[in-house]
Amino acid sequence: MTSKSSSWKALLKNWEFKVAAFIGIYFLISHVVLETTDVVNEKGLKSHLKVLPEEVIDYYGKQPFSNVDKYAYMQYATNYDYLNLAIINFIHLRKANTKIPNLVIIYDEVLHYYASDKWSELYQVANQYKITLKAAPLIKASYQDDSNWAASFTKFHIFNQVEYDRIVFFDSDSMLVDIPNEIDFDNMESRFNHIDELFKIPQELSFASPQAYWLNNVVEGKSPRPRKNVEIPNKKRYSLRMKKLVNDLSIYQDFNLLPSLIYENHYFDNANHFFANHIMVITPSKNTFQELMRYIHNPWWWSITNRGSLRKPNDYDMEILNKYLNNELQRKRINVGILPHRVYGVLTGEFGEEWHERFVVEPQYLPFINKKSNKGWSPLEFFKKIKVVHFSDSPIPKPWEEENNEEHYNIKKIYCDKGDMEKFHKDYPVYKPRLTDDCDSVSIWNWFREQFYKERSGYWFA
């Protein structure tokens, strides 16, 4: 007995034994007890991640509302410009006769102290259109961080608004549009439009947003391409499939009938940036809000138990939300929908790109396309589909920011090669936009900005 006891004491003093014991305990806790993101389990993703095609959302949009009192549109603002933008967007919704009574802007609580004149004007306009301004503390990972995205975590307050059953959120640097069938860029204005149909997607989906199609590792060649060949259906075949799907949904009312991703690594190879979050449909939950706060302000024990979810210095709202969704999907604790990006997730910068097939295809077919391809691209056709457009053209300034035609960022703009060349050289004496024969895309890009100036007329105080 004494010999065994002394052997055990000697073993405890052995550093190699201590290291091995620590590794064993760490593995047990992290991989068995806590199920961290280091374990990738592909089984079951198809049951929890669903594609919401345009035709399906159109079908849901035609269904009657049950009770809109518990629904809300939301935006957030951390400065006066974005508060003003949010108010303009909600004025648009009111003029579009949205059925949703609650239009709520979450704003940084210090805004009504800094510039009283601006605040007073903005508050009066918001009150006139029955827009609720709700103060909330700024959320930042570090108050030493002064980057453009440092305060973007503030948008996560929307998850804590549990007085509502469903929220449709969009960033305030977006614009709602309804494009006329007859295109005349010189004399055309958008009609007023809402996106009430998003409140009607299946209740089983507690989160939905478009795919960040512009950040796909497979298309960029950073992740292996699928081994199997998948034929992307032409318009006619795809239309027939959608008609059958809508018919089946009308009969069975089962969200499991919705399409899934064809290639599961399409998600797993892009898990940190798969979902865009400039527009979201969410089910508020205090648990979700508290969990997101942990993803921003990591508990000390995550360094041991949840290393895959630790926030990196350049992780902001989009990256953090994707980490959270990745964990929830792998643990099969959430049902998520992929909204059609060509309707709700459009970036203005798309019309300045050289290649467009990644925008053209349905989300499930993205891994099977070529990066440098314009197959299926018809700018006017896609222009007419858009309901929400997000001003995103970095490094080109936003339309409410000051521009200078002599700055380097002008090389990121586009100019019709059939346009006025004398004006081209006069307007851009140093850094010149890229000349393109896609003149419709040039007209569309310019029209978005001109439409914004019309939208803000009479309501711009910032």
Swiss-Prot record:
Map motif DXD onto the chain: 171-173
Q: Which GO terms describe its cellular component?
A: Golgi membrane; vacuolar membrane
Q: Which InterPro entries match?
A: GNT1/Glycosyltrans_8, Nucleotide-diphossugar_trans
- Which key words are in the record? Golgi apparatus, Membrane, Signal-anchor, Transferase, Transmembrane, Transmembrane helix, Vacuole
Q: Which residues lie on this side of the membrane: Cytoplasmic?
A: 1-18
Q: In the Enzyme Commission scheme, what number(s) does this protein have?
A: 2.4.1.-
Residues assigned to the Lumenal compartment are 36-462
> Which ranges does the record mark as transmembrane?
19-35
Q: What is its main location?
A: Golgi
Sample GO molecular function, one term? glycosyltransferase activity
- Report the domain of life of the source organism: Eukaryota
Q: Where in the cell is it found?
A: Golgi apparatus membrane; Vacuole membrane
Membrane association type = Single-pass type II membrane protein
Q: Does the keyword Transmembrane apply?
A: yes
Give the PANTHER family listed for this entry. GLYCOGENIN SUBFAMILY MEMBER
Record function comment = N-acetylglucosaminyltransferase involved in the Golgi-specific modification of N-linked glycans.
Family the entry assigns: Belongs to the GNT1 family.
Record protein name field: Glucose N-acetyltransferase 1
In which organism is this protein found?
A: Candida albicans (strain SC5314 / ATCC MYA-2876) (Yeast)
- Which gene codes for it? GNT1
